[in-house]
């Protein structure tokens, strides 16, 4: 069962003069920021350009904005569930790309009439629980080349948890028809999924509310919904030459 967490718990004023410094500190500490100071797509793009480089995406427009809404022109298919009203399972954005976006930004234009709750799980918390209580499961989920993430050409071979050269941990996961796992991983997936459910946070996004998510740390999804829910998503790669990019990159320090 998802634990409802107030939107205010991660809230920051992203329009302030020192917003970048505050966002950098919050993302380095918590991996998530929520905001309600953006009033237009133009302001959203301005915010995102301050955070890093906007990444192009298959479904994005020329500016890098992806409109996330129920679309009748797209037939149901793996990798396109975001454009339906169905439940969207917890996942890493760009799991099938070698270097996924550092940040995912989602901004609400129109909330759902019913449902459409945003779902989140802190991969750092899951990692720490596994390290303390189920170290053998963590070892299995960290085995190199124990997972295949399809959806791009070529697909990516990796693992649910991987370690970067600097010791930081990156979570890469999807649980749909484009995620394939070796037999040892499949044997521990029920426990992993149980932990995801146990530690899921949820809250609705109202009009002109949004969030910034550290993509290598937090998994995200949504519940099924009714109504004309409309969101805009932007994928961002942080620049290590900036103050934000120095402290916010793809992954987390497991012991901090």
Listing of model-derived features with the role each one plays in the protein:
Residues 2-14, 23, 63-256:
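Active-site environment of non-heme Fe oxygenases that use a 2-His-1-carboxylate facial triad
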Residues 1-66:
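N-terminal non-catalytic cap/leader segment that marks the start of a structured domain
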């Amino acid at each position: 069962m998802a634990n409802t967490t107030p939107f205010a718990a991660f809230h920051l004023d992203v329009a302030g003069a020192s917003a970048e410094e505050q966002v950098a500190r919050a993302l380095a500490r918590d991996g998530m920021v929520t905001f309600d100071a953006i009033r237009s797509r133009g302001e959203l793009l301005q915010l995102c350009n301050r955070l890093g480089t906007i990444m192009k995406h298959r479904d994005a427009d020329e500016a890098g904005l992806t409109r996330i809404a129920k679309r009748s022109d797209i037939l149901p298919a793996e990798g396109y569930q975001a454009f339906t009203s169905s439940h969207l399972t917890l996942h890493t954005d760009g799991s099938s790309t070698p270097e996924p976006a550092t940040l995912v930004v989602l901004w609400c234009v129109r909330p759902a009439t019913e449902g459409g709750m945003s779902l989140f799980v802190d991969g750092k918390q899951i990692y720490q629980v596994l390290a303390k209580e189920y170290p053998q499961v963590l070892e299995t989920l960290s085995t190199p080349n124990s997972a295949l993430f399809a959806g791009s050409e070529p697909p990516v071979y990796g693992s649910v948890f991987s370690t970067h050269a600097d010791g930081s941990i990156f979570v890469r996961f999807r649980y749909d028809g484009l995620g394939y796992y070796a037999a040892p991983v499949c044997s521990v997936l029920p426990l992993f999924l149980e932990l995801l459910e146990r530690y899921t946070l949820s809250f609705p996004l109202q009009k002109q509310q949004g969030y910034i998510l550290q993509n290598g740390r937090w998994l995200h999804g949504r519940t099924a919904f009714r109504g004309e829910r409309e969101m805009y998503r932007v994928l961002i790669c942080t620049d290590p030459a900036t103050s934000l990019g120095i402290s916010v990159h793809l992954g987390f320090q497991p012991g901090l």
